[in-house]
């Protein structure tokens, strides 16, 4: 069992906030894309800031190299999601399915990465959480 310091609790709360932001900015992106809304550019810009926000929160605990790696994996998560949304909107089933497979493979990479940087973060649990997130987003 892991015991947490005050700093770790602050990180967990910050991560919770960032995940919430990730979810609603992703939803805004999907809605803006699907409905051809005029706010797609600022919504996309804000959504793509989210990986950097995560990296900034992780840096004091894990250093720049680890934070940058997470930022890259999470940016890929968003870019793949955009490919999936755009393929679905264009009714390109093969492209959508390829993006969907890539999205789940990226979730596997994120789960593995997070389990390697923190002994309290278990790969199977992260994978289940990320898959739930993807399924609810689809």
Stretches with model-predicted labels:
Residues 4-15:
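Disorder-to-helix initiation segments
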Residues 32-65, 73-114:
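Alpha-helical segments in soluble extracytoplasmic regions
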Residues 107-138:
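An amphipathic alpha-helical core segment
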Residues 13-31, 71-85, 128-138:
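N-terminal extracytoplasmic segments of bacterial inner-membrane proteins
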Residues 1-2, 20-28, 47-53:
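Short alpha-helical hairpin
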Residues 3-4, 114:
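Short, motif-level signal for alpha-helix interfacial/capping segments enriched in acidic residues
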Residues 13, 68, 94-97, 124:
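Short, solvent-exposed positions on alpha-helices
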């Amino acid at each position: 069992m892991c015991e947490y310091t005050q700093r770790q609790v602050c990180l967990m709360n910050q991560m919770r906030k960032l995940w919430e932001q990730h979810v609603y900015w992703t939803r805004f992106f999907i809605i803006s894309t699907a409905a051809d809304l005029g706010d797609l550019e600022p919504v996309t810009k804000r959504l793509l800031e989210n990986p950097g926000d995560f990296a900034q929160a992780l840096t004091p605990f894990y250093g720049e190299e680890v934070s940058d790696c997470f930022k890259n994996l999470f940016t890929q998560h968003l870019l793949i999601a955009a490919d999936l949304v755009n393929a679905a909107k264009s009714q390109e089933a093969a492209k959508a399915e390829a993006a969907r497979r890539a999205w789940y493979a990226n979730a596997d990479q994120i789960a593995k990465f997070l389990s390697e940087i923190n002994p309290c973060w278990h790969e199977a649990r992260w994978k289940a959480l990320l898959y739930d997130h993807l399924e609810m987003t689809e």
